[in-house]
Every structure is written in C-alpha cells, then in structure tokens.
Amino acid sequence: MSQPITRENFDEWMIPVYAPAPFIPVRGEGSRLWDQQGKEYIDFSGGIAVNALGHAHPELREALNEQASKFWHTGNGYTNEPVLRLAKKLIDATFADRVFFCNSGAEANEAALKLARKFAHDRYGSHKSGIVAFKNAFHGRTLFTVSAGGQPAYSQDFAPLPPDIRHAAYNDINSASALIDDATCAVIVEPIQGEGGVVPASNAFLQGLRELCDRHNALLIFDEVQTGVGRTGELYAYMHYGVTPDLLTTAKALGGGFPVGALLATKECASVMTVGTHGTTYGGNPLASAVAGKVLDLINTPEMLNGVKQRHDWFVERLNSINHHYSLFSEVRGLGLLIGCVLNADYAGQAKQISQEAVKAGVMVLIAGGNVVRFAPALNVSEEEVTTGLDRFSAACEHFVSRGSS
C-alpha cells in the first residue's frame, strides 16, 4: 500500500518557493473542489485565472482522452494536426498571422521580448535594444521576464539583470513618453495589471502607447496571459480597448488547466524569426493543443462572452453589498471575471488574512499584493455557485472584522 500523502509532506520534500494552503484538494467539478477530508470549497481563484471552464469539464476531458489514446509527443522536428488547428483558430479570432506555442505565460513573454529585440536589430541596428515596461507589472519568472516585471521583490536576488529595461508608471502616458525613444525596441504592458492589484489600463493610456510605439518604430506587446481567453468578456482584452498590439502573449486559460502558452504575431514581426532562432521541446504538443482547441471552441462564443459580463455584474453587486455591511474595501474594480477588492486604509496589508478566513469558510480567493483580494473564477460559474461562494465570503469578512475588533 502506498504511503498516505499529507500537507506536511510538502514541507519535507519540496523546494520551499510556495506556501500552499493547509489542505490538499483531491477532486473538482465545475467551480467546486473537495479536499482529502471531504470538505467542499467554492473556487473563485480558478487556479490563478487558469481554470476558465472549471474543474474536470467533460468536453475537455473528452478532448484530452481522445488525443491521449493516439500519441502524446513528437518534439519540434514534426508538427501535428491539433496544433495546426489551434493555430488557425487563434489566427481567425485575432489580429495575428503567425503563432508560436510554448508551455507557459513566462515562456510566451520571453519569446515576445526576444522577437522584439531581433526585429529591431535586424531592421534598425543593435543600438535599438531598449525595453520599456511598467512598475508593479508581472510578466513571469525567467530572468528576462522577471526583470521586465516592475517588482524588485521578485528580481533583486538575481543580479546582474538583463540591461536596457526601464520602468514607467502604469496608466501614466507622460511617464511612458519620457522613456520611449528611438532606441526603444518594445513596450510590454498588461491591459489589466493582475498581480499588481487588478488595475485596468485606461483607453487613453493604451492608445497613447500605440501612438508612441508607431512614432518610434517600437513593437507594442500586450501581455494577456491573465486577461486573455474570455476573462474580460472579450476573447482578448485588446478587443475591449480597441487598441491592437504587434505581439500578444497568452497562456493560463488557453489550456483550461492544461499547460500551454502562445505568442501571437503579425506576419511582418514573425518574419525575423527563422529556424533555430527560438524553440521549445514541448511547446505545441498534441495533448495541450487538443485541449486548448476545445477551450477556444467553448469560450469564443457570444453566449459565453456575454455571460462573463453578466457574471461580472453578479459579483460586483454582491461584493458592494458585502462591503456596505463591513466597510472593508475602498473600491471594487476590474473587467469581466477579473475583479479586485481594494482594502481601505483601516485594513491595509491584510488581504492574505482575509483570503485565509475565506478558505476556512469554504471559498477560495486570491490576493494581488497586500491590499487587494482578487477573484478570477471560472467563466461558466453558475449563479448558485456565485451565491453560495459569496455567502461564504461574506461570513469570512464578518469573522475577519469581528476578530480584529475583539
């Protein structure tokens, strides 16, 4: 008989880069999870905006099982039917002409930054290497992407960092304009800063970045790892804003829980990449591609995308009602089903404590820094699941407030 697994085993066996919850989920269905003891949780965290169709969606399981019965992997010396079908679906649904597949958002952003540097060097010379990113951004954990992310806490232990990366203030076009010049090869920006606090960009800000990039022959990269694949109520957030990037990165929800990432590019941008300039062993494998293709089929419909907007209203209305009772939040913000509750000054820095109370009450939420409680539920979360989950969240807020005042 195999050894029983406990949460303590994590501390014994794993490199301690995470601090997971005190329970271990063992089964999921829709927006519900159950742990080893059988306790039920409503999942409003969505695996950090990954499980866009909930847990164990029957059509995703069918797509995975069907491909798994054929073959799993060949390497990049061969292509496969599922990846080509997936590429065509993304091209047909977006501005892109070409796609590069990888395994994660960090890999997609790494590929985008490398492409942007090569594009600028080939077209304008090696002096054009500057990258402008934004404070409080998050683009991944590779050395290049963690340097582009404007959060020193994630990069300060790994110096020397890649050079020629500067950070402007988010949503401040004057700050960006002061840094973007003819030596800039790319600007990388999240349409909504997710890890940075669920902060949506303004239309004027993104439009201003588009104009600055055009003026200085720089590529505009939208990091849509968290905002993409229906999260905002559009297939990609750039469609909400009406500002088209040159490159777009996507991952998380694209696989519905199966690891996959992609870089979307125009034909002109993609033309600088040739055999051997970049690559990945697993990217675009048939298992991931089969699942992601089904994810797009299910999400990229008017019914699903309009449903995201409706569910946004359910969440915001109820969260504002909860806040009316407990006066925890200064603001409820976000687009679609990426929602942040900003703690007011009386509770600054205590988002983690609220998330811990939520877990005790049977609902899973995220944080985005110390001051924001973040919701990124499945896009198909039911009205009953929303009601039950927010009832539990309300109870958690009540307990948090009463504990603090006792």
UniProtKB/Swiss-Prot annotation:
UniProt-listed Pfam families: Aminotran_3
Question: Is Cell inner membrane one of the keywords UniProt gives this record?
Answer: no
Cofactor(s) this protein cannot do without: pyridoxal 5'-phosphate
Could you tell me the EC number(s) of this protein?
2.6.1.81
Top-tier EC class = transferase
- Superkingdom of origin organism: Bacteria
Task: Point out residues bearing the modification N6-(pyridoxal phosphate)lysine.
Answer: 252
Known catalytic reactions: N(2)-succinyl-L-ornithine + 2-oxoglutarate = N-succinyl-L-glutamate 5-semialdehyde + L-glutamate
GO MF terms listed in the record are: identical protein binding; pyridoxal phosphate binding; succinylornithine transaminase activity
Q: Give the matching PROSITE patterns.
A: AA_TRANSFER_CLASS_3
Q: Which InterPro entries match?
A: Ac/SucOrn_transaminase_bac (IPR017652), AcOrn/SuccOrn_fam (IPR004636), Aminotrans_3 (IPR005814), Aminotrans_3_PPA_site (IPR049704), Class-III_PLP-dep_AT (IPR050103), PyrdxlP-dep_Trfase (IPR015424), PyrdxlP-dep_Trfase_major (IPR015421), PyrdxlP-dep_Trfase_small (IPR015422)
Could you tell me which PANTHER family the record lists for this protein?
Answer: AMINOTRANSFERASE CLASS III, SUCCINYLORNITHINE TRANSAMINASE
Report the sequence similarity comment from the record.
Belongs to the class-III pyridoxal-phosphate-dependent aminotransferase family. AstC subfamily.
Protein name according to UniProt: Succinylornithine transaminase
Which gene holds the coding sequence for this protein? astC
